[in-house]
Amino acid sequence: MTNELSNAAGASQQGPAASSFSADTPPRTTAGGDVLVLLLIDVAPAARLWGYGRFVAGTTPALGEPGARFAKQLGTGYEGGFGLRPSATRQGLFVLFEDEAAADAFIGRSELVQTYRRNARELCIVKARPYSARGSWDGQKLRVGSPAPVDGPVAALTRASIRPSQAHRFWPNAGPSQDSLERAAGCRLAVGLGEAPFLRQATFSVWDSVAAMDAYARTGAHQRAIVASRDFFSESMFVRFVPLSIEGVWKGRRYG
């Protein structure tokens, strides 16, 4: 998504290599608010039919989990990237829980998550709590329940429904900004996600700090994309999170 970081900023006050991310001393949080669990999977070759079946099943299995209040089954761009070419094996499951206890039970004891583990070539699980949010996703708004972090890692989500009449203008402007995101200093994880080809897209990224994320938001490619993106979206949502835990492997990099 082209205008992820500047809009997310406005929502607040204005042997793979290992990641340094650690949740041994998670940030302090206030009671209440949603907790996100994001599953990122690269489906094993022997489990391709199971992987395709995730889109047939949709969000029904996830919404049957205790405490789950909103869910989206998502595809990704090729190799987890941001282009128009879809990936045949990489996908995501986005689930919002009413509290952290429900999120932890889902990660630790859910048969759905265990099924993901059994069928994965790679699996990365992110747990995070929003500290600022603007906009909606299919009419749903995130409940904020965490203070803004003083330091440490942050995550950002942007999603949008692209107006069909503007898709031909959106995608040429999206490419340079999104390609630069993966290479940006301080970006630990970045993935392009989507509900529907071309028109319902999202980006999720994790950063070393707010400063690193804001520095990327001021880069030339990103700023040009922001200017070009006006009036592209019929609905959008921009969220910043405090990451509570990241564990697993994504695109060859180990987290946790």
UniProtKB/Swiss-Prot annotation:
Phenotypic effect of disruption: The mutant, when grown photosynthetically and chemoheterotrophically, produces hydroxyspheroidene, hydroxyneurosporene, spheroidene and spirilloxanthin, but does not produce ketocarotenoids.
CDD domains xref list: CrtA-like
Region (Disordered): 1-26
Pathway, per record: Carotenoid biosynthesis; spheroidene biosynthesis; Carotenoid biosynthesis; spirilloxanthin biosynthesis
Cofactor: heme
Keyword annotations: Carotenoid biosynthesis, Heme, Iron, Metal-binding, Monooxygenase, Oxidoreductase
Cofactor binding summary note: Binds 1 heme per subunit.
InterPro entries xrefs: CrtA-like, Dimeric_a/b-barrel
An example molecular function term from Gene Ontology annotations: metal ion binding
GO biological process: one example: carotenoid biosynthetic process
Top-level taxon: Bacteria
Biased composition (Low complexity): 1-23
Catalyses which reaction(s): spheroidene + 4 reduced [2Fe-2S]-[ferredoxin] + 2 O2 + 4 H(+) = spheroiden-2-one + 4 oxidized [2Fe-2S]-[ferredoxin] + 3 H2O; spirilloxanthin + 4 reduced [2Fe-2S]-[ferredoxin] + 2 O2 + 4 H(+) = 2-oxospirilloxanthin + 4 oxidized [2Fe-2S]-[ferredoxin] + 3 H2O; 2-oxospirilloxanthin + 4 reduced [2Fe-2S]-[ferredoxin] + 2 O2 + 4 H(+) = 2,2'-dioxospirilloxanthin + 4 oxidized [2Fe-2S]-[ferredoxin] + 3 H2O; spheroidene + 2 reduced [2Fe-2S]-[ferredoxin] + O2 + 2 H(+) = 2-hydroxyspheroidene + 2 oxidized [2Fe-2S]-[ferredoxin] + H2O
Enzyme Commission (EC) number: 1.14.15.9
Enzyme class, first EC level, given as a word: oxidoreductase
Entry's family note: Belongs to the CrtA family.
Task of the protein: Involved in the biosynthesis of the carotenoids spheroidene and spirilloxanthin.
Name the UniProt record assigns to this protein: Spheroidene monooxygenase
Organism: Rubrivivax gelatinosus
Lineage of origin: Bacteria, Pseudomonadati, Pseudomonadota, Betaproteobacteria, Burkholderiales
